[in-house]
């Protein structure tokens, strides 16, 4: 008996994670394939294309130009140049309901 593989044509949900860092740095990480690949945008509007990389713990994405982001439990490191780490923190929007 052959089993049919069900293929879904619905696009994957886009996931977005925002980070903040020193000197008003903001970083947006966006992926539609569960962070196998991602687009990282900094607050100057520059876009970096990253792919999943090996990490001991947490999630790490990098490209061949030395750009990387590595994060776990809301804390992380971003490198726009190899060996120049910048500490970042995940920024979650707080919804305030006026009463």
Placement of each model-derived feature along the sequence:
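Cysteine-centric segments in proteins
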Residues: 2-99
